[in-house]
């Protein structure tokens, strides 16, 4: 493959040799990557410097706020301590006998008496508020500084000063107008008198000549005074116009800044409301998914424990009653045996069967037969456990007790 080589010799230094290829272009000039890297380094360095400056400013502000907060916290603690001391001093004064002279209660509604009738927490709250007034004012001012309302307050003070200055300038303008009008009237009067004297120039007397000379001098002074009054009036009117313009601009700026501040506060309150709603929803989810099941399990467990304890107590009571019944039966049987052992010489009297005895024995036989059938039926059932109701348990216990007593009497 044939490749054409063209050597281009540039007049400027340094010399660059390029190789031309119809398909590929190779350049042996300076590398542009280093230039791009340097450019990006400069841009990033500028951004990094700006961000570092902002971070330093933020850190300084936070440090200043922390120092102010610590100072105000110390002041608040000192104020509360002073309030407690004053409260204790007031209580000591109220208990002092030297300060409680009341002429046998004839003097009513003394300040100390009213103060004693007030509640302690009300007096403490009043003293705390009085002591923390400076701290509250400082906290309010710090809040205004953070939200930017302090600048708006300064702007409002500037507007008030501009209004006062404009009011004073208007007074000066009115005075300058009066002086200017007075100067115009004085000059026009002197010119009118000069014209009258000039009309009868041929018949002047020495007095008229002196008067003309004086009027001529006064005319020059009046002209100068009029010119000065005019210049001063123009300056005051220009100042009034400037103050009016500045006042108008300041009022517009104030309304604009207050609108921005109110929008910022409204936006902050909206975000605060959303955050509170999110926190409430989070707490609701936590309570419903975590705490409520745990609480339910705990309640069920405690209820089961209480039921088990109640059943155990009932079982203990039943066992105690059965043991007492068995002890009573054993004691009766022991007494019966002792009686039979102590009286062996007595002859046994044959028992006479009566109809009532036969009926009682038949009932006992029926109950025993029913018990045997029931136990046999229970053994035939697939379940091995037997469940008694309270009434069935009581009837079964009564049957056993009566059977034991009957056997004891028979023996």
UniProtKB/Swiss-Prot annotation:
Assigned keywords, A-Z: Coiled coil, Membrane, Mitochondrion, Mitochondrion inner membrane, Transit peptide, Transmembrane, Transmembrane helix
Spans within the Mitochondrial intermembrane topological domain: 292-411
InterPro entries, per database record: MDM33_fungi
GO terms under biological process: inner mitochondrial membrane organization
Keyword Transmembrane helix: yes
Compartments it resides in: Mitochondrion inner membrane
Coiled coil, from the record: 69-103, 148-250
Cellular compartments per GO CC: mitochondrial inner membrane
TM region(s), chain numbering: 271-291
Bilayer disposition of the protein: Single-pass membrane protein
PANTHER family noted in UniProt: SENSITIVE TO HIGH EXPRESSION PROTEIN 9, MITOCHONDRIAL (PTHR31961:SF3)
Subunit structure: Homooligomer.
Function of the protein: Required for the maintenance of the structure of the mitochondrial inner membrane. Involved in mitochondrial morphology. Causes growth arrest when highly overexpressed.
Entry similarity comment: Belongs to the SHE9 family.
Protein name, as recorded: Sensitive to high expression protein 9 homolog, mitochondrial
